[in-house]
């Protein structure tokens, strides 16, 4: 794909050593000083890329290096929306912020984050994207990354993500909900057909 080569050429101009080594990616997740989310999991990224495969999705995720050492990760992909316009995101909608190893100097982190923002601008220019959405992943506060973005943002708004640990049984999941929600959950059990699928396919989400 011609556009894919162009996008990676832009990426390598900023991060010539970047790759997507599975073990290094996992190591960053284990040693991060940030609240890593499900959106930072490599399998989640692969899922979204697969889900949007009919929309020309391209996995642009990166391991970030400093002095030849892996110090951070950046989930990122490009795909076309229903209007055939390109979108940059980490989950089909929003750009997920990078996370870094513990004890990385603030000066180094800020330098890498600046490069990422400039990279996003250049990728957006190549893809003729006029607007991107960003998400804050910190609990009860804004991350430094997101605070910097607020200074540049044209518009801000609040959204909420409800995340569920699907490794638990349905009964265990129910126990973790607040009591006031349980009547609604029980109603859902009565009215919906609820199943657990170990091998999930794209077609199941399209039905």
Protein language model features and the residues they cover:
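A structural signal for short, well-ordered beta-strand segments and their strand-loop junctions
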Residues: 63, 72-75, 128-136, 163, ...
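Hydrophobic, Leu/Ile/Phe/Ala-enriched alpha-helical segments that form helix-helix packing faces
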Residues: 29-32, 48-49, 120-127
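Acyltransferase donor/substrate-recognition loop-hinge adjacent to the catalytic core
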Residues: 1-23, 28, 148-207
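Non-catalytic accessory segments adjacent to catalytic cores
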Residues: 111-158
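Short, solvent-exposed loop/turn segments at secondary-structure junctions
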Residues: 77-81, 95, 137-142, 169, ...
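Conserved donor-binding loop and adjoining core beta-sheet/short helix segment
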Residues: 12-17, 46-118
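Short, basic/aromatic recognition patches
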Residues: 31-54
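Extracellular structured ligand-interaction cores
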Residues: 59, 95, 129-131, 159-161, ...
């Amino acid at each position: 794909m011609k556009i894919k080569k162009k996008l990676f050429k832009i990426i390598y101009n900023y991060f010539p050593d970047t790759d997507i080594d599975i073990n290094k990616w996992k190591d960053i997740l284990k040693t991060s000083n940030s609240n890593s989310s499900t959106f930072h999991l490599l399998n989640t990224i692969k899922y979204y890329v697969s889900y949007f495969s009919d929309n020309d999705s391209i996995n642009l995720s990166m391991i970030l290096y400093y002095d030849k050492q892996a110090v951070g990760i950046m989930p990122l992909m490009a795909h076309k929306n229903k209007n055939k316009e390109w979108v940059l995101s980490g989950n089909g909608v929003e750009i997920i912020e990078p996370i870094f190893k513990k004890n990385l100097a603030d000066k180094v982190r800020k330098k890498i984050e600046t490069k990422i923002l400039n990279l996003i601008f250049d990728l957006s220019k190549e893809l003729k994207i006029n607007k991107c959405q960003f998400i804050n992943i910190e609990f009860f506060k804004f991350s430094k990354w997101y605070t910097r973005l607020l200074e540049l943002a044209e518009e801000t708004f609040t959204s909420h993500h409800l995340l569920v640990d699907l490794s638990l049984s349905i009964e265990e999941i129910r126990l973790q909900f607040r009591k006031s929600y349980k009547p609604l959950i029980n109603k859902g059990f009565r009215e919906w057909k609820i199943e657990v699928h170990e091998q999930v396919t794209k077609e199941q989400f399209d039905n």
